Amino acid sequence: MILLGILASTTIIGLTSSAPLSSYERRDVSDNRPKIFLLMDERIPELENEILGNELGSDVTRTKRIGSLSIVNNLDVLRNRVMLELARRKQERDQRQIEENRRFLENIGKRSVPVSDAGKIVRSDKSRNDRNQPLQFNRIEWIEEEDPLFRGSQDDQMTRVQANELRLL
């Protein structure tokens, strides 16, 4: 029974000495600081500066100690890695969009090329090596002079020119 009494009194003394700060003592602690400081009996400025030194807006540099792990530091590292990964994915997505736009712009608007420039476009496309060969082949095939549609339009022009010359004579 005596042992139980000693244990109970020790527990009560321990609980009262480790009680959180009273409202009077809390007035010195600002609201933007972590609430963990309210659990301590005494203020330890070195500990507060070390813990608060890792916040995003602070310019305080913290020296690394071997063998110590910090939850805040690990979260900063993970946050930086996630941000770098998101930036990398966005860059890849933007690069793919740029490539798709480039391919689209190479194919669009090439069908309305004047007849006099058709040979130049065919030669410049054939001399260029691009990894998008099927797209170039379709464009070249449409513009080439051996194309029956292209040859037919030339024949129509020649017929009209000859008819105009005959009228003038």
From Swiss-Prot:
The modification Isoleucine amide is found at residue 108. One of its GO terms (molecular function) is hormone activity. Its main location: secreted. Regulation of fluid secretion. Disulfide bonds: none annotated. It comes from the Eukaryota. This is Diuretic hormone 44. It comes from Camponotus floridanus (Florida carpenter ant). Residues 83-108 form a coiled coil. Expressed in brain, ventral ganglia and the retrocerebral complex (at protein level). Residues 1-18 form the signal peptide. InterPro entries: CRF. The modification Pyrrolidone carboxylic acid is found at residue 97. It is found in: Secreted. Residues 19-96, 109-169 form a propeptide.
